Curated annotation (Swiss-Prot):
Its EC number is 2.1.1.-. This is Ribosomal protein L11 methyltransferase. PANTHER family: ELECTRON TRANSFER FLAVOPROTEIN BETA SUBUNIT LYSINE METHYLTRANSFERASE. One of its GO terms (cellular component) is cytosol.
Length: 292
């Protein structure tokens, strides 16, 4: 099935606003690309991972009307400030090729690279996670995923069991296994996410250490680490479940939280967990703590 693709070029400070607008308008995928051929490495904590000029690609179903979409997007912009744009009809195979051309390796910490599965890793001796997320799932460029990967690279995961709740592409579960964990359970309500996770685990040689599950079918095991990169609302609902899924002394890593939601999350989880100082990237927060 063909798609309608919008391409808009904005500054780094405008990316979040535009991405949110595109998602609200019905985009099935929003991808951030380098607009000026500027190299991107995973930055230190607190620094933006975006290029100074960023091209935002948004994919809409073919049934969408481009003129209506543009009118909707322009409503919240002054006429002279709306970004330059173009749109085109994109066949499935062309979208996949374009996406593959722009997915570049990213480094997290001193030892982990997230690399496209079709390119050789920049540092073959490093810990290399080969990722092929497809249209629907992320690659590590979003601040919440970057925060989680950075935290995992600094943790002692040897012989650990980890639960990745809301796994998407499986990037966090697979990273944990590549960094020394011996078992991982990847949980997601979307069957396509579970399929993508299994395929990515196979590409990385860790499928024998990984189980996938929907939330409704999850067996309540105990984990040494539980990471949940979702959103504040489901995190608030899941606090008691996460307490049941973790050993005393186990680590809990929560992301997908904005700065103004920290206190509500801490109050909800305070019955079971003690948290360290938040890690913040842009306005996104990672809360890491341990089970009492």
């Amino acid at each position: 099935m063909p798609w309608i693709q919008f391409q808009l070029e904005v500054s780094a400070g405008q990316v979040e606003r535009l991405s949110d607008q595109l998602s609200e308008a019905g985009a099935v995928a929003v991808t951030l690309l380098d607009a000026t051929d500027q190299p991107l490495f995973e930055p230190p904590p607190g620094e933006t991972p975006l290029w100074s000029r960023t091209r935002v690609n948004a994919l809409f179903p073919m049934a969408s009307d481009p003129d209506t979409l543009l009118q909707e997007l322009k409503q919240d912009w002054a006429p002279e400030s709306f970004p330059s744009y173009r749109w085109e009809i994109l066949a499935d195979q062309n979208w996949e090729r374009a996406w593959m051309d722009h997915f570049k390796p990213l480094r997290f910490g001193s030892q982990l690279w997230v690399c496209p599965s079709w390119l050789p890793p920049p540092e073959p001796e490093a810990v290399n996670l080969l990722l092929d997320p497809g249209l629907a799932f992320g690659t590590g460029t979003h601040p919440t995923t970057a925060l989680c990967l950075e935290w995992l690279t600094n943790a002692n995961l040897n012989q650990a069991c980890i639960i990745d709740y809301g796994c998407g592409s499986g990037i966090l579960a697979i990273a944990a296994l590549k960094l020394g964990a011996t078992a991982a359970v990847a949980v997601d309500h979307d069957p396509q996410a579970l399929l993508a996770t299994q395929e990515n685990a196979t590409h990385n040689g860790v499928i024998s250490q990984l189980q996938v599950s929907s939330p409704s079918e999850l067996i309540e095991i105990k984990a040494d680490f539980l990471v949940a990169n979702i959103l504040a609302e489901p995190l608030l609902r899941l606090a008691s479940l996460f307490a049941r899924l973790t050993y005393p002394g186990a680590y809990l890593i929560l992301s997908g939280i904005t700065s103004d939601q920290i206190q509500q999350i801490l109050q909800t989880y305070n019955n079971w967990f003690t948290f360290n100082t938040p890690m913040i990237k842009e306005n996104w927060v990672l809360l890491a703590g341990h089970r009492r």
